[in-house]
Amino acid sequence: MKKKKRILSFGLAVCCFVGLLGINTQKVKAAEYWPQDPETESPNAIVMEESTGTVLYDKNSTEQHCPASITKIMTTLLALENCSLDETVTFSKEAVYNTHGSGISRDVGEQMTMEECLYAVMLESANECAYAVAEHVGGTVENFVQMMNDKAAELGCVNTHFNNPHGLSEGEDATLHYTCCYDMALIAKAAYQNETFRAITATKTYQIPPTNKHDEITYLQNHNEMIHAFKTRGQYLYEYCVGGKTGYTTAANSTLVTFAEKDDMTLICVIMNAQSPAQWTDSIALYNYYFENFSLYNVAQNETRLENGEMDTGMLNTNSSFVKIDPAGNIVLPKSAEFSEAAPAVSYDNTSDDVLANIRYTFAGHDVGGADIVSTGVKADTFSFDNVKEEETSTETATTTKH
């Protein structure tokens, strides 16, 4: 009986915490203001805050288009998740002769490390390297493409189908290889959480040492004009840009994924189907606007309703050590708004031993982020339940069973 009471009380602590937030939701004042979206030339674009997934700007973001070489973000992500950087990649005849366009002139039988290949893929957009990486990771390109599509589904992509690892879209690929700005933002968000990916995409120049087929160093340059003056003499350099990937084919027009960081907030911008130089000018304009008008708030640091005891929380008032707000959770709000104006809603999580529930916040009709409610790891038997009346426990047990 004592064990059941302890388990029940742990659940009640969570329920009381949820109830606390639910009551205070009624006190959140109506907040209607959301900054008006700026104008852009590009027909398809999105700006997403990286830590929350909040969409700040949406212009036809789920419309299907050819991605061109921004495809290689997915290729790089899968390689990093499935391989070590020091693995040796050997270039097949297919990798060398079944690709064209951008590349670094590798030969059949040439060997490079996975790390060197990924720098070539992300900086020089080397198609033969993307093909070789796909063969190495998946065994065959076909298997790797299936991995790409499986990963897209896992990330919640809504309008994506990959048909190759490099983004060239000719013949069959012109209709079978497609994605959208929203999906590319999800893929970019997942990739950016990888430390090695962040290091690669932020690199301006890189040197591949001599190989078994090349006697000299191969010099690589990042084609992202927002972090490295590659062809435009620096007119599109953006001080807050920390990486990205370019793309272009005649079918796709110009595509661009970039990351920018300012004031502890990271934004992801995706541009598709653009006429150059709109991919650069629109990205910079969007970053400037959303950095100027939005701020990031840490939920654990700002959600004070638990500590303030704004309602009688019963067990929670004496037993709050069981649960806490995950310090990794954030929300993003217009700078004119206060944290308390965001309305919280709590849902339970039955899929994890550590995550008990999740708080999601909305503001002016927008989902702006949230945080997990997690167990602190405090054992139930460290808390004295002597102050819990037996009849109260019986009533609570019945209520809990009903739910």
What are these regions (language model features)?
Residues 17, 21-25, 52, 96, ...:
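Generic "edge-of-domain/loop-turn" microfeature
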Residues 14, 28, 50-51, 262, ...:
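Short, ordered coil/turn segments that flank beta-strands lining enzyme active or ligand-binding pockets
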Residues 22-195:
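Active-site-adjacent loops and short helices of periplasmic peptidoglycan-processing enzymes
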Residues 11-14, 101, 239:
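A residue-level detector for conformationally permissive "hinge/kink" positions
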Residues 17-18, 84, 294:
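Hydrophobic alpha-helical membrane context
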Residues 157-158, 175-403:
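Domain-terminus/edge residues, biased toward the C-terminal soluble/receptor-binding domains
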Residues 2-29, 403:
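Sec-dependent N-terminal signal peptides of Gram-positive bacterial secreted proteins and lipoproteins
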